[in-house]
Regions:
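Amphipathic protein-protein interaction modules
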Residues: 64-154
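N-terminal "domain-start" segment
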Residues: 1-104
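Acidic, proline/glycine-rich low-complexity IDRs
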Residues: 1-20, 120-177
Length: 177
């Protein structure tokens, strides 16, 4: 992942303050990074860029460490039974469509999915599409949230919400959506 710079971000105002967005390369995928800065005050562009700059030092460091921790994330997802849960969701009547001509085969969005889902197929299907955190005027940040979706969509429009701590370690919050 390349180091994120101030100029990589667009800054927009919303009802709760400001947010900064950038498209980044994370885990060798295109992801959207969203940073929220909650304030009721009017803040100049110079001040906003200063706040962003202070936060980016930590964010760059955390994301760099997290990219090296994909095996730790996969171990967590396996321990918390998400690969088996994906298989259950695919087989569920609201999940995939059973292909009658093939054993243990289901269609999801015109993709054939064979059950049980393997760890390799589960990992290949992961998308790190949305990443976000709150930032503060002193440069501090909250743990980073990562929303993992899947292609094919094993969890019928849901994602797995994870957090990345300051050391780049993952924790799993659960299904969201």
């Amino acid at each position: 992942m390349k180091k994120l710079l101030i100029d990589d971000f667009e800054i927009e105002k919303n009802d709760w303050g400001y947010y900064f967005t950038a498209n980044i390369d994370f885990m060798q995928q295109n992801s959207e990074l969203l940073l929220n800065y909650d304030t009721e005050d009017e803040v100049s562009e110079v001040e906003l860029k200063n706040i962003l700059n202070k936060s980016l030092e930590k964010i760059n460091n955390v994301l760099k460490k997290a990219e090296k921790n994909k095996p730790q994330l996969m171990k967590l997802l396996k321990e918390k039974n998400y690969i088996n849960l994906a298989t259950e969701w695919v087989k569920w009547e609201e999940g995939g469509i059973k292909v009658e001509e093939e054993e243990n085969c289901y269609l999801i969005d015109d993709n054939k999915v064979y059950t049980p889902i393997t760890e390799k197929d589960f990992e290949k299907s992961m998308n790190f599409g949305e990443i976000g955190t709150d930032i503060y005027s002193d440069g501090e940040t909250e743990d980073i949230s990562v929303y993992i979706t899947f292609e094919p969509d094993y969890f019928a429009g849901h994602c797995i919400e994870c957090y990345i701590d300051k050391n780049g370690n993952f924790s799993v919050n659960g299904l969201a959506g």
